[in-house]
Amino acid sequence: MTRSEALFEQAKKTIPGGVNSPVRAFNGVGGSPLFIEKADGAYIYDADGKAYIDYVGSWGPMILGHNHPKIREAVLAAVHNGLSFGAPTELEVQMAEKVIAMVPSIEQVRMVSSGTEATMSAIRLARGFTNRDKILKFEGCYHGHADCLLVKAGSGALTLGQPSSPGIPEDFAKHTLTAVYNDLDSVRTLFEQYPIEIACIIIEPVAGNMNCIPPIPGFLEGLRTMCDEFGALLIIDEVMTGFRVSRSGAQGHYGVTPDLTTLGKVIGGGMPVGAFGGRKDVMQFIAPTGPVYQAGTLSGNPIAMSAGLAQMEALCEEGLYEALSAKTKRIAEGFKAAADKHGIPMAINYVGGMFGFFFTEQEQITRFDQVTKCNIEHFRTFYHGMLDEGVYLAPSAYEAGFLSMAHGEEELRLTLEAADRVLARMKAAM
């Protein structure tokens, strides 16, 4: 028994399922999860001391790589001044100014401690501002585990085969309408059915919780048009895509302006941070300037703000996003080339620092229903083959992969050589 396996057995005695977030349990791929002891650059190291090239990156935040010296130094410097004050700090102001400077649609921003808090608060704000109850989301998109959003969700809920979750009253769920991602007709049908009841649309601009599915041309623009037509707010959930797809997020990459934006992951530099922001007239509706209540004991935590600011400043380096996109393209297209070489059907998607691959004969994956038809057994075999080769991918067929600036030529080469060997073994076993 490895030390990771022993720790997993020990953890299950005191922690439900042995993990503090379901996808970490390896239910989507089988076997026991790795327990990680440390990380540096493009690598993570398990409890047995084995190194892995990491394409999870803590599920997105580690865009510069693990243990980046600038972030580490910023955190250590902040710790000397105290861990938490429960009062405003200059760091919060600096972070707000940095976010607003990088994302033109955000005129004011409120810090929170998680992506779930950000989306939950943005939904409440949209409902309060419009005085409407219903929200519109998309099947397979995940916006955290708030009751109103855990309906036909992606991420861990999809991995577990649960389109929603027990514990959510029907009275809550009935206010959540679900449309088909990349299908404007399905959205219009719902707006025509509830023309004055929908407070907002919330969407992942690149769906990263049913693997990786970018928007088709015109889709995000069409949502903007319909929101304007029916008086609803457009919330773009950039918890995953914010500052990863481009310096101004997916909205900047695709040229779409939302009313509200939710952020997380990258802005924390590895610390627990979320945020929501947008039009000033909407944001002024939040307490203490408005009637919609939202609060948080650790919101704007000085240690988290220090880590986030250090990362955000580093992301302003010229040419960084072009280099990150080139790395991502090489991995995604390299996987596809290796699969083609060995006669194993595969489709790929990638944008910015995100990528996805699907074992399927479908040429292009653009919708949730297509994702559910992919070959999960092939994914599981490939996953464990890559793990044995020292490559750590997301342990679910429904999660995007992430590159970092720490992934260099050596890591990319080793990853693609490993993929070639694993796919060759898979073909030989068919």
UniProtKB/Swiss-Prot annotation:
It comes from Shewanella sp. (strain MR-4). Belongs to the class-III pyridoxal-phosphate-dependent aminotransferase family. HemL subfamily. Homodimer. One of its GO terms (cellular component) is cytoplasm. One of its GO terms (biological process) is protoporphyrinogen IX biosynthetic process. The modification N6-(pyridoxal phosphate)lysine is found at K265. PANTHER family: GLUTAMATE-1-SEMIALDEHYDE 2,1-AMINOMUTASE, GLUTAMATE-1-SEMIALDEHYDE 2,1-AMINOMUTASE 1, CHLOROPLASTIC-RELATED. It is found in: Cytoplasm. The gene is hemL. This is Glutamate-1-semialdehyde 2,1-aminomutase. Disulfide bonds: none annotated.
